[in-house]
Amino acid sequence: MPQETEQFCRDVNRMSAYLALDDFGGSGPGPEVLSGLDVIALLGNQVIATLKAACELMRRSLGATLVLSGGAGHSTPLLYDNLRLSSYGGLVRQGLVRETMAEAEMYTAVAQAAFHIPAGSILIESRSRNSAENARFSLQILKDANRRQRTILVLQDPTMQRRSMITWAREAEIAGSDARVLSHAVFVPAVEPGLDGMPRFPAGQVQGTWTMERFLALILGEVRRLRDDENGYGPRGRSFLPHVEIPEPVIESYKRVLASRLNAVAVR
């Protein structure tokens, strides 16, 4: 296997592991955590595993509120296509999930029809277009509905999990929320060398996720946003985020992947 591909995959996986922030060491929330959850918040994304996990955790919780957040954006048609090709595709054929829906509305259709989660346990936030609005509008609808929110579990596309948590913390501070907020990355995305010398997803990460082009664009875009320089979202850039101290090995991996011919070939 070409050494270049092996190095490329190691670098991609290092960035991915950093971005997929998880407070549970990969094992997921246990019964003790679930029994104390007030809110499970799923932020709009295209990865079907995040929707499935949020609904399954909701069913195991004791009276939590499920917040489904997501308007219409870049991920919306990708979410629809992934749902259409998934085990929930029957809901598309029945017209319960439609291409014109906001992400939160698609989520709601699946949560109710496939997981039998009562409508009264769900709050739908269908206006947000970015991670800041996901957090801001979710906190607002919880307040408007007078729902208890002492402990909140947040799920997002694993590539966006770290930035979403940083953004949520900032929006919570602005809103005066002192809730305990937990992060759950449903899985850590990975790539491996293929027989053709190109990076590929392991078999279990092919369906309901991303194209390789989309995945590489996401992780490179996330690290770029987190970097506190003129191109990032930190104080030295667009000031959307506080300063983030990214580990140097992650920065080095980012630079190598950005410069690699494999990145250019993979996204063609």
PLM region spans:
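C-terminal accessory domains and tails appended to enzymatic cores
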Residues: 253-268
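Generic secondary-structure transition motif, activating predominantly at the C-termini of alpha-helices
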Residues: 13-19, 23, 220-231, 258, ...
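A structural signal for short, hydrophobic/glycine-enriched beta-strand patches
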Residues: 1-208, 264-268
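A conserved mid-domain beta-alpha-beta active-site/ligand-binding segment of alpha/beta enzyme cores
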Residues: 190-256
